[in-house]
Amino acid sequence: MAIGLIGRKVGMTRIFTEDGVSIPVTVIEVEANRVTQVKTLENDGYRALQVTTGAKKAHRVTKPEAGHFAKAGVEAGRGLWEMRLGEGEGEGIEVGAELNVEIFADVQKVDVTGQSKGKGFQGGVKRWNFRTQDMTHGNSLSHRANGSIGQNQTPGRVFKGKKMSGHMGAERVTTQNLDVVRVDVERNLLLVKGAVPGATNGDLIIKPAVKA
């Protein structure tokens, strides 16, 4: 897998092309990603880069975290993220190095991963796009009810994964093949066409698109 970066969703706006066409874009702030660990086949069984970004107040850094960041010689960040590396990727990157948005200068499309907005407990109509039942014709209580959830004595159970009411959202979601509209190295900004998962200020993982 290609090297990606950790960013923060700033919000949405629009930009205009020379032809006057309006393009909706999401602004992603990509601060310097500091390499905290380089995992190798010999030591860890797989190749990966572990990075952090941002800052965390000193009193919120646990002792294990403090030791890990101190060993890498980098400032404590707001989290740790790991990105798998393919054969030949990440060569020459050492612990303590900084990666910035400039690595996307020649990238046309990206995949963006984030945590979707939580919607709480929702019914089948909202959560799974179930059809509603009749509003009239003798139906007075079951307009938005899910309906049958199984068969009879055989199999005598409800199958795992059955679409039912429950907690909606707050899941890891990836939006693929978003066009890179602009890379602003001076302000550490990446502008991508369209929407990305999650709420404003949410953390995002941006990687070159796998299906591009």
From Swiss-Prot:
PROSITE patterns per UniProt: RIBOSOMAL_L3
Post-translational changes noted in the entry: Methylated by PrmB.
Keywords: Methylation, Ribonucleoprotein, Ribosomal protein, RNA-binding, rRNA-binding
GO process terms (BP): translation
A single cellular component GO annotation: cytosolic large ribosomal subunit
Region (Disordered): 137-156
Biased composition (Polar residues): 137-155
Pfam families membership: Ribosomal_L3
InterPro entries reported in the protein's UniProt record: Ribosomal_uL3, Ribosomal_uL3_bac/org-type, Ribosomal_uL3_CS, Transl_B-barrel_sf
PTM annotation (N5-methylglutamine): residues: 153
UniProt keyword Oxidoreductase present: no
Any one GO MF annotation of this record: rRNA binding
Domain of life: Bacteria
Quaternary structure and partners: Part of the 50S ribosomal subunit. Forms a cluster with proteins L14 and L19.
NCBIfam families: L3_bact
General function of this protein: One of the primary rRNA binding proteins, it binds directly near the 3'-end of the 23S rRNA, where it nucleates assembly of the 50S subunit.
Similarity-based family: Belongs to the universal ribosomal protein uL3 family.
Listed name of the protein: Large ribosomal subunit protein uL3
